[in-house]
């Protein structure tokens, strides 16, 4: 059983982090003309939708948002479950020639992002793929890094980062959980 060790971000901290990331995305890409956001199921989806809302507030332009299910692209599929739950990928636009910003809640080993890259490449040939995460907790196993980070949170192997979003969890905060070995 995991116990809560510390709260990293509250509702306002999450909001401020996403607002800053939205500004960084706009600035780095010189606007939103060729931009699409793709949220990685599960918590990357509401974060991508929120970023799109912030970008619209700032730029006055709507940025398309897609939903990516990476279940069948994971390299740990056999350890997940006998019958993994596969949900649909909903990317109702072409990614070819676009600047695709993948959005997820936490980056840890990099394996989820690797699977997402494979899934995106099966949809087309983007001009550029960038990564936005709310939390970077370190401990990468693959040479992958986020372009946009809400907060860097160094953790130990006994700790987990839990992002709780209103849309999914009914509360809004990020906490570190400590697990018993």
UniProtKB/Swiss-Prot annotation:
It is an enzyme of class 2 (transferase). SUPFAM superfamilies: PRTase-like. Its EC number is 2.4.2.9. Keywords: Glycosyltransferase, RNA-binding, Transcription, Transcription regulation, Transcription termination, Transferase. It comes from the Bacteria. It catalyses: UMP + diphosphate = 5-phospho-alpha-D-ribose 1-diphosphate + uracil. A motif (PRPP-binding) lies at residues 100-112. GO terms for molecular function: RNA binding; uracil phosphoribosyltransferase activity. InterPro entries: PRibTrfase_dom, PRTase-like, PyrR, PyrR_bifunctional. The keyword Transferase applies. One of its GO terms (biological process) is DNA-templated transcription termination. Gene3D superfamilies: 3.40.50.2020. Belongs to the purine/pyrimidine phosphoribosyltransferase family. PyrR subfamily. Regulates transcriptional attenuation of the pyrimidine nucleotide (pyr) operon by binding in a uridine-dependent manner to specific sites on pyr mRNA. This disrupts an antiterminator hairpin in the RNA and favors formation of a downstream transcription terminator, leading to a reduced expression of downstream genes. Also displays a weak uracil phosphoribosyltransferase activity which is not physiologically significant. HAMAP family: PyrR. Homodimer and homohexamer; in equilibrium. This is Bifunctional protein PyrR. It comes from Pelotomaculum thermopropionicum (strain DSM 13744 / JCM 10971 / SI). The gene is pyrR.
């Amino acid at each position: 059983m995991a116990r809560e060790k510390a709260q990293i971000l509250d509702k306002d901290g999450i909001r401020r982090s996403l607002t800053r990331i939205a500004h960084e995305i706009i600035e780095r890409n010189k606007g939103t003309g060729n931009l699409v956001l793709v949220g990685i199921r599960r918590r990357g989806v509401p974060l991508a939708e929120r970023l799109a809302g912030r970008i619209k507030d700032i730029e006055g332009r709507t940025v398309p948002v897609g939903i990516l299910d990476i279940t069948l692209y994971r390299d740990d599929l056999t350890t997940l479950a006998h019958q993994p739950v596969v949900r649909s990928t909903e990317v109702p636009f072409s990614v070819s020639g676009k600047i695709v910003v993948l959005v997820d809640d936490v980056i840890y080993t990099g394996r989820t992002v690797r699977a997402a890259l494979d899934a995106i490449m099966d949809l087309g040939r983007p001009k550029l793929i960038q990564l936005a995460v709310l939390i970077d907790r370190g401990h990468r196993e693959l040479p992958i890094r986020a372009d946009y980070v809400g907060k860097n949170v160094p953790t130990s192997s006994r700790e987990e980062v839990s992002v709780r979003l209103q849309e999914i969890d009914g509360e809004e905060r990020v906490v570190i959980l400590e697990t018993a070995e």
